[in-house]
C-alpha cells in the first residue's frame, strides 16, 4: 500500500514537472527522493562517487533509454559494479535495467514492452551496493524526436533582374515516429544562413514538412538545417544534416546590383549643404528678411510740417503752420466768450418782485459791473470768463488800438447819442431840464465788446452825473426800447434778438447830431509816444465846435518819435462833410453779445456795432505823433 502511495505522489508531481534529458526539475527530484527514502531507508546517495544520470530520452513516445556517466574509479569491466534499477506504479518492487547494450555504453534501454505512457517511473543508479544517483519522470515528458530526414530544396522563381530567387525546402519526419497515425504530433523549426556566416537565422515553428524561402540572392550559397519537437513541449531534438543550397551560375552582368549606391551618405551631406546655404543666405540678407518678417512701423507724418520741428520742440512754428488750415485753430485764437453758458429761470415768482430788468441794467450795480477786475466768478465751476490771462490779452489788444474796435466805437457813440437825444427832449419839457444845458456835452461810458474804454474829456465827472440822472428818469425810460425777444444764443456767446420797435410814443427823432456825445477837445493824457489815428480823426472833425465852447487848448508831451500815420489831411477835409449828413433812423440790432450776468434773470448786453455811414473808417489803425497832431490842428 505504501508503494502505491509513493507512485501516486510521483505521478502527480510528474504531471506538473517534466523530466528533461540529463537534468530533472529540482523540486520533483527532491519530493521523489524524500518519498523513496521514507519507503526504503537504505536508499542513500553516495556523494563521494562521480556516477550520475545524464539524460533519459524517448524518440517516438514508444520506447526510451537512460544514460549515465562513468566514474573515475568505476568501470563496467567489473560485472555488477554499477547497476540501474527502476520501479513504476504497476510493479511493486525494484527491477534491474532490462538492456544495458542496445542504447550504448553506460545506458539502459527500455523497449515497448517495458514502456508505459502516462506512467511515472523512478530510477536509481548504484555502485557496489550504494545508491549513486536517482530520478523520477514520465515518458511523455522526455520525448526528443530524431532529426528529420530527406532534406532538399526546389527552385520556385527567379526575379526579372535575375538577382533574387525563391525556393521551397522539404524534408521527411523521423522514420521511427508514427506521425501518420497521429500517435505523436511534431513541430519543425528551420535554420538557415549564408555560407561563411556564423549566425543562423531562424524561422517560425511549422507543423508541415515544407517551407518556402524568398528573396535569396542567386550569387550566394546558403546552408539549411531542420529540427523537431513534440507539440506543446519545449525541448527540441537534434538538428538534421545541413543542406547546402547553390544556385546555377548566372550572367555576371546580373550581379552589378551588388554595388549599392550610398544613398544614406548623399542624403546626410545634402542636408548639411542645404543647412549651410540657408545660414549663409540668412546672414547675408538678414536686414531684408527682418523687414519682410517684421515690417517697420511707419513714422507719423503731418503734411506740410517738418518732423524736426516736433523733435526740437518748436511748438510756435507748428501752431503757425497748423493755423493755416481751416480745421485747426490754436487755443489762443479761439473767440472766448465772456460767459460760456446762461442759466435762465423764468418760473421763479419771487424773483419778479425784486425789480425790473430795466432798473437792474441802469442801476449803480451796472456801473460797478464795469470794473470787471472785481467781478465774482459764478460760472458753476467752469472756466471763469474773468480769468486774468484772458483779461490781460483783451486789454492788451485794446490798448494796441485794434482797428476793429476803433471802427465800432463811433457806431456805439452814435447809438448812445440817439438814446440821449430822446432823453434830452423829454427833459426839455420839464422844469428840471433848464438847469442842465445841452452844451455840457456829457460823456457816456459804453461797454465795448472787449473792455470798457472811456474817452477822457473835460468835465467827465459832471457829465457822467448828468447822464446818470437822465437815464434814471422814469419819463425818459418810457420811450426807449430796453427789451427785445431773445430768439437764439450762438455757441460764441452772442444773443440773437428779434427786431424791436421804434419810439413807442411816436416822438420825432432828435435832430441833435452825434457830436453831442462825441468827445470834445481836451487835454489828452499821452501815456506813450503815439496814439491811435482814429482818435486823431475824431478830434480833427470836432475841432471847430469844440473851440467855440471850450477854452482849454490841447497840450501834448513832445517826444522824438516816428510817425506811421496816413491820410490825416484828407480826414480833416472830410470831417465837415460828415457833419452835414442827416442822421437816419438807428436800426435795432439783431445780434449782441453778453457782457455780464448779474442774476439768473438779468443780462448786461454789449453795445452792438451799427452800419457805418462812412467807409473810410474801415482802414487799419495808424499811429500819429503828438508833433504832427499839433501841426495839423486848426
Swiss-Prot record:
Glycans are attached at residues 46, 73, 111, 152, 157, 196. Disulfide bonds join 56-66, 97-108, 122-136. InterPro entries: FN3_dom (IPR003961), FN3_sf (IPR036116), GHBP (IPR025871), Growth/epo_recpt_lig-bind (IPR015152), Ig-like_fold (IPR013783), Long_hematopoietin_rcpt_CS (IPR003528). Residues 285-634 are cytoplasmic. A motif (WSXWS motif) lies at residues 236-240. GO terms for cellular component: external side of plasma membrane; extracellular region. A motif (UbE motif) lies at residues 336-345. PROSITE patterns: FN3 (PS50853), HEMATOPO_REC_L_F1 (PS01352). The keyword Phosphoprotein applies. The WSXWS motif appears to be necessary for proper protein folding and thereby efficient intracellular transport and cell-surface receptor binding. The box 1 motif is required for JAK interaction and/or activation. It is found in: Cell membrane. GO terms for molecular function: cytokine receptor activity. GO terms for biological process: endocytosis. Belongs to the type I cytokine receptor family. Type 1 subfamily. A motif (Box 1 motif) lies at residues 293-301. Keywords: Cell membrane, Disulfide bond, Endocytosis, Glycoprotein, Membrane, Phosphoprotein, Receptor, Secreted, Signal, Transmembrane, Transmembrane helix, Ubl conjugation. This is Growth hormone receptor. The modification Phosphoserine is found at residue 337. It comes from Ovis aries (Sheep). The soluble form (GHBP) is produced by phorbol ester-promoted proteolytic cleavage at the cell surface (shedding) by ADAM17/TACE. Shedding is inhibited by growth hormone (GH) binding to the receptor probably due to a conformational change in GHR rendering the receptor inaccessible to ADAM17. On GH binding, phosphorylated on tyrosine residues in the cytoplasmic domain by JAK2. On growth hormone (GH) binding, forms homodimers and binds JAK2 via a box 1-containing domain.
Amino acid at each position: 500500500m505504501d508503494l502505491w502511495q509513493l507512485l501516486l505522489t510521483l505521478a502527480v508531481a510528474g504531471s506538473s514537472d517534466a523530466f528533461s534529458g540529463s537534468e530533472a526539475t529540482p523540486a520533483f527530484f527532491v519530493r521523489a527522493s524524500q518519498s523513496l527514502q521514507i519507503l526504503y531507508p537504505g536508499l542513500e546517495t553516495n556523494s563521494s562517487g562521480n556516477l550520475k544520470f545524464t539524460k533519459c530520452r524517448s524518440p517516438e513516445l514508444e520506447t526510451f533509454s537512460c544514460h549515465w556517466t562513468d566514474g573515475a574509479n568505476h568501470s563496467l569491466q567489473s560485472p555488477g559494479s554499477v547497476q540501474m534499477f527502476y520501479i513504476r506504479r504497476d510493479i511493486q518492487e525494484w527491477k534491474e535495467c532490462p538492456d544495458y547494450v542496445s542504447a550504448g555504453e553506460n545506458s539502459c534501454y527500455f523497449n515497448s514492452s517495458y514502456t508505459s505512457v502516462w506512467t511515472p517511473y523512478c530510477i536509481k543508479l548504484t555502485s557496489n551496493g550504494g545508491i549513486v544517483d536517482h530520478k523520477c519522470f514520465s515518458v511523455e515528458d522526455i520525448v526528443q524526436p530524431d532529426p528529420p530526414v530527406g532534406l532538399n530544396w526546389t527552385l520556385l522563381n527567379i526575379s526579372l533582374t535575375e538577382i533574387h530567387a525563391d525556393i521551397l525546402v522539404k524534408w521527411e519526419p523521423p522514420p521511427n515516429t508514427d506521425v501518420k497515425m497521429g500517435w505523436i504530433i511534431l513541430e519543425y523549426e528551420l535554420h538557415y544562413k549564408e555560407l561563411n556566416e556564423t549566425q543562423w537565422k531562424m524561422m517560425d515553428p511549422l507543423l508541415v514538412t515544407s517551407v518556402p524561402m524568398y528573396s535569396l540572392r542567386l550569387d550566394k550559397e546558403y546552408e539549411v538545417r531542420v529540427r523537431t519537437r513534440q507539440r506543446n513541449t519545449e525541448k527540441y531534438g537534434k538538428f538534421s544534416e545541413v543542406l547546402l543550397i547553390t544556385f546555377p551560375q548566372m550572367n555576371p552582368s546580373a550581379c552589378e546590383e551588388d554595388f549599392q549606391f550610398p544613398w544614406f551618405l548623399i542624403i546626410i551631406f545634402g542636408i548639411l549643404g542645404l543647412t549651410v546655404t540657408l545660414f549663409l543666405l540668412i546672414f547675408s540678407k538678414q536686414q531684408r528678411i527682418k523687414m519682410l518678417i517684421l515690417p517697420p512701423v511707419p513714422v507719423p507724418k503731418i503734411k506740410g510740417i517738418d518732423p524736426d520741428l516736433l523733435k526740437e520742440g518748436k511748438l510756435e512754428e507748428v501752431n503757425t503752420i497748423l493755423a493755416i488750415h481751416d480745421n485747426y485753430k490754436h487755443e489762443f485764437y479761439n473767440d472766448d466768450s465772456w460767459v460760456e453758458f446762461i442759466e435762465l429761470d423764468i418760473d421763479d415768482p419771487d424773483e419778479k418782485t425784486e425789480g425790473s430788468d430795466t432798473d437792474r441794467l441802469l442801476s449803480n450795480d451796472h456801473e460797478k459791473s464795469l470794473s470787471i477786475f472785481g467781478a465774482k466768478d459764478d460760472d458753476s465751476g467752469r472756466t471763469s470768463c474773468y480769468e486774468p490771462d484772458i483779461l490781460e490779452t483783451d486789454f492788451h489788444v485794446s490798448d494796441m488800438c485794434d482797428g476793429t474796435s476803433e471802427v465800432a466805437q463811433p457806431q456805439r457813440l452814435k447809438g448812445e447819442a440817439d438814446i440821449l437825444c430822446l432823453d434830452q427832449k423829454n427833459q426839455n419839457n420839464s422844469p428840471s431840464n433848464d438847469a442842465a444845458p445841452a452844451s455840457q456835452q456829457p460823456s457816456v461810458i459804453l461797454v465795448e465788446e472787449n473792455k470798457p474804454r472811456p474817452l477822457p474829456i473835460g468835465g467827465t465827472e459832471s457829465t457822467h452825473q448828468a447822464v446818470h440822472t437822465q437815464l434814471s428818469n422814469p419819463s425818459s425810460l418810457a420811450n426807449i426800447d430796453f427789451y427785445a425777444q431773445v430768439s437764439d444764443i450762438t455757441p460764441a456767446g452772442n444773443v440773437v434778438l428779434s427786431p424791436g420797435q421804434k419810439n413807442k410814443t411816436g416822438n420825432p427823432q432828435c435832430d441833435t447830431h452825434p457830436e453831442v456825445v462825441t468827445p470834445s477837445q481836451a487835454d489828452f493824457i499821452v501815456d506813450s509816444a503815439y496814439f491811435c489815428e482814429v482818435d486823431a480823426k475824431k478830434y480833427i472833425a470836432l475841432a471847430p465846435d469844440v473851440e467855440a465852447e471850450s477854452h482849454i487848448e490841447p497840450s501834448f508831451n513832445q517826444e522824438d518819435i516816428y510817425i506811421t500815420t496816413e491820410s490825416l489831411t484828407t480826414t480833416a477835409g472830410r470831417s465837415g462833410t460828415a457833419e452835414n449828413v442827416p442822421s437816419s433812423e438807428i436800426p435795432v440790432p439783431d445780434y449782441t453779445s453778453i457782457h455780464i450776468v448779474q442774476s439768473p434773470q438779468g443780462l448786461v448786453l454789449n453795445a452792438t456795432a451799427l452800419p457805418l455811414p462812412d467807409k473810410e473808417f474801415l482802414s487799419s489803425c495808424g499811429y500819429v505823433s503828438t508833433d504832427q497832431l499839433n501841426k495839423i490842428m486848426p
